[in-house]
């Protein structure tokens, strides 16, 4: 009996050590660098998807969406005389994804640019991805099939753990009427967005250059803003104002999808996906209000 107890304590201690090491790895290594790693992975995913562009017929409108808009199924678009191919670029809100488009053999007709591209702090992630990027990593996308899947296991696991409580609340309420209660915890920012730092200014100038090059190459652009979580986003209005300021001299239209489509009253299944009904509403708005820019 004593031997069994000692063996149990020893094995338990070993399991405890392993658990502690895993926890430290997640807290100290994985999570802090996740945005840069995920953005770099998104970059390789986008490269493989861009290879499909030459196979698309001239009659097809190619929509390079981002985040939620990039996951809208093509069957949700209903206009019979305007076939849609949703390229579904990952991280299209990030500047590195926009720069990737410049290397494509054929530019998409319409690109939706997420307004959180200009959220403070993104310039750090962008620089990390740029520093880590190399031609060898681009070539790796051809040999790693999971990078070309629409949902990578890491993303699914991360978003499930991050949005478990949000999913439960969504299933219970079925919509976002309770969003007003969240504003008590996260009050909206008052006044204009804070002035950009030196790094942010350089980042925004780089974004302007990239957007200008895309426009000169014949690509139609549109800025879109959509809440990507159930929680109230205090950066919503400042993001919209900053993006509108950037878009004005470039003649880029700006759409607030949350207000235009009534997204606050639409149900979400988790942090990434819209329900089929909400997705159809989103797709129809894109068809009627955004895609005509490519005509």
Per-region residue spans from a language model:
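N-terminal Lys/Arg-rich, disordered targeting/topogenic segments
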Residues: 1-12
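Hydrophobic membrane-insertion alpha-helices, especially the h-region
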Residues: 10-33
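Alpha-helical transmembrane signal-anchor/signal-peptide segments
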Residues: 33-57
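Acidic-and-aromatic substrate-binding clefts and catalytic sites of carbohydrate-active enzymes
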Residues: 91-94, 199-203, 229-238
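Extracellular serine-dependent O-acyl
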Residues: 221-224, 240-266, 285, 289
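Histidine-centered active-site loop/cap adjacent to the catalytic His
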Residues: 268-295
């Amino acid at each position: 009996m004593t031997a069994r107890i000692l063996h149990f304590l020893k094995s338990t201690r070993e399991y405890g050590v392993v658990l502690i090491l895993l926890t430290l790895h997640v807290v100290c290594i994985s999570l802090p660098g996740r945005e840069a790693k995920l953005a770099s992975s998104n970059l390789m995913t986008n490269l493989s998807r861009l290879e499909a562009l030459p196979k698309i017929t001239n009659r097809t409108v190619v929509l390079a969406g981002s985040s939620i808009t990039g996951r809208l199924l093509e069957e949700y678009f209903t206009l019979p005389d305007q076939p849609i191919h949703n390229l579904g670029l990952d991280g299209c809100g990030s500047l590195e994804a926009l720069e990737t488009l410049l290397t494509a053999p054929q530019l998409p007709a319409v690109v939706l640019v997420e307004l959180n591209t200009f959220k403070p702090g993104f310039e750090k992630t962008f620089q990390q991805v740029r520093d880590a990027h190399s031609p060898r990593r681009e070539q790796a996308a051809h040999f790693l099939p999971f990078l070309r899947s629409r949902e990578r296991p890491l993303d699914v696991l991360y978003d499930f753990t991050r949005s478990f409580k949000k999913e439960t609340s969504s299933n219970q309420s079925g919509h976002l009427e309770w969003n007003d209660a969240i504003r008590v915890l996260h009050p909206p920012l008052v006044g204009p967005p804070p002035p950009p730092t030196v790094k942010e200014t350089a980042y925004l100038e780089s974004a302007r250059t990239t957007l200008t090059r895309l426009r000169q190459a014949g690509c139609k652009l549109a800025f879109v803003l959509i809440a990507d979580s159930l929680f109230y986003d205090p950066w919503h209005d400042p993001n919209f104002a900053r993006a509108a300021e950037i878009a004005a001299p470039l003649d880029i239209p700006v759409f607030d999808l949350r207000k235009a489509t009534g997204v606050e009253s639409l149900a979400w299944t988790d942090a990434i996906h819209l329900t089929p009904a909400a997705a159809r509403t989103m797709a129809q708005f894109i068809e009627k209000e955004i895609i005509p820019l490519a005509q």
